[in-house]
Swiss-Prot record:
<dbReference type="InterPro" id="IPR023214">
    <property type="entry name" value="HAD_sf"/>
</dbReference>
<comment type="function">
    <text>Bifunctional enzyme that catalyzes the enolization of 2,3-diketo-5-methylthiopentyl-1-phosphate (DK-MTP-1-P) into the intermediate 2-hydroxy-3-keto-5-methylthiopentenyl-1-phosphate (HK-MTPenyl-1-P), which is then dephosphorylated to form the acireductone 1,2-dihydroxy-3-keto-5-methylthiopentene (DHK-MTPene).</text>
</comment>
<dbReference type="GO" id="GO:0043874">
    <property type="term" value="F:acireductone synthase activity"/>
</dbReference>
<dbReference type="GO" id="GO:0000287">
    <property type="term" value="F:magnesium ion binding"/>
</dbReference>
<dbReference type="Pfam" id="PF00702">
    <property type="entry name" value="Hydrolase"/>
</dbReference>
<dbReference type="GO" id="GO:0043716">
    <property type="term" value="F:2-hydroxy-3-keto-5-methylthiopentenyl-1-phosphate phosphatase activity"/>
</dbReference>
<dbReference type="InterPro" id="IPR023943">
    <property type="entry name" value="Enolase-ppase_E1"/>
</dbReference>
<dbReference type="GO" id="GO:0043715">
    <property type="term" value="F:2,3-diketo-5-methylthiopentyl-1-phosphate enolase activity"/>
</dbReference>
<keyword id="KW-0486">Methionine biosynthesis</keyword>
<dbReference type="GO" id="GO:0019509">
    <property type="term" value="P:L-methionine salvage from methylthioadenosine"/>
</dbReference>
<comment type="pathway">
    <text>Amino-acid biosynthesis; L-methionine biosynthesis via salvage pathway; L-methionine from S-methyl-5-thio-alpha-D-ribose 1-phosphate: step 3/6.</text>
</comment>
<keyword id="KW-0028">Amino-acid biosynthesis</keyword>
<comment type="similarity">
    <text>Belongs to the HAD-like hydrolase superfamily. MasA/MtnC family.</text>
</comment>
<keyword id="KW-0479">Metal-binding</keyword>
<comment type="subunit">
    <text>Monomer.</text>
</comment>
<comment type="pathway">
    <text>Amino-acid biosynthesis; L-methionine biosynthesis via salvage pathway; L-methionine from S-methyl-5-thio-alpha-D-ribose 1-phosphate: step 4/6.</text>
</comment>
<dbReference type="InterPro" id="IPR036412">
    <property type="entry name" value="HAD-like_sf"/>
</dbReference>
Amino acid sequence: MIKAIVTDIEGTTSDIRFVHSVLFPYARERLADTVRQHDSDPEIAQVLNALRQELAQPDADSDTLIAALNQFMDEDRKSTSLKLLQGIIWRAGYRNGDFQGHLYPEVAAQLAAWQQQGLHLYVYSSGSVEAQRLLFGYSNAGDLRPLFSDYFDTRVGAKRETDSYRTIAQAIGLPAEQLLFLSDIRQELDAAQEAGWHTCQLIRDDADSVSRHRQAARFDQIDLPEYAQ
């Protein structure tokens, strides 16, 4: 029996185009000014020091850091330092009302229904926990943060690595066979399945004929009793 659901964000709860067409450009436009003008802010200074360690350049100046961050964005690298800095920038954007977090139409109602059924809900995304909380806290369906028990990002490991799902299961405190992971990416689901989890692939756009995972086009098409068989 499924007792907890862990969901991805991009392509799963939210249109990937919101992330790539709204969030990423917004952060990119403000990265340089954030690094140059706010490097004395303790929160930002901590991120920049972590970035220096990531680059193995403890004395890297602002220009070097900015160049590295832009390169990471170009490569879509899952850099924890980049994700943390993006989260700080997006926080201001959400609070200023520059945008709202996008959710597919059925997502909020289905998440609420699962919670009412006694399921615990979690998020696992390559975006920072801060960015996850912001997207769901300032979503186009309102503040959904009360629905979630916890959030996980790449600090537990990469999403295509099996050990990441073992770490999450341990943090949640449930055996893998009671956990369901939702994602649009087959390779992430492969890793979760290898760790003993149940899986469901969200097919929001093009079909994935290679996948061996159960598939659904919408959250309200996910039949939880199937996973008890």
